């Protein structure tokens, strides 16, 4: 497993890009405050660097609520969204931190649907975000990677 210092990218972090997207947001957005210790712990569990959009969301936020909480993007966890990205997946999609996962739960919506990053276990392109609606057992390919999914959630028509 990579150490925290290996996961924190100070030369080319993705957070400034996310801040640009936040400034363009067409939907109401609430960035939940992070707890530094939880952010570090969740980043280690995910093993994703802050150079990636996912790593930056985990490390810089307690989560992101879009459209008054209609869509909830997992970060490092907070009082309003008490689930960290890494912790939420352990026991659900992974046996332990950094273990391979068929998919990785990244967000959910108020209707009861789940969004997951395909780790190769869903029928479709690995790395794409998939949606599991509450009324069907079929995962649907959103045809976007994590970064494009977050950008769509912020500026697109939900």
Give a label for each model feature.
Residues 1-122:
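A surface-exposed partner-binding patch
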Residues 125-158:
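Compact, glycine/acidic-enriched structural inserts
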């Amino acid at each position: 497993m990579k150490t925290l210092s290996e996961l924190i990218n100070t030369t080319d972090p993705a957070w400034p890009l996310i801040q640009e997207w936040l400034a363009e947001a067409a939907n109401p957005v609430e960035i939940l405050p992070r707890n530094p210790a939880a952010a570090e712990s969740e980043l280690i569990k995910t093993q994703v660097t802050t150079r990636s959009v996912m790593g930056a969301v985990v490390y810089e936020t307690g989560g992101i609520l879009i459209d008054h909480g209609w869509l909830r993007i997992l970060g490092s966890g907070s009082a309003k969204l008490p689930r960290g990205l890494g912790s939420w997946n352990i026991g659900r999609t992974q046996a332990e931190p950094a273990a391979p996962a068929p998919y990785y739960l990244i967000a959910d919506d108020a209707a009861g649907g789940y969004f997951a990053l395909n780790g190769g276990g869903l029928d479709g392109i690995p790395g794409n975000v998939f949606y599991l609606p509450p009324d069907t057992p079929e995962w649907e390919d959103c045809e976007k990677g994590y970064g494009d999914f977050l950008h769509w959630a912020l500026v697109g028509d939900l």
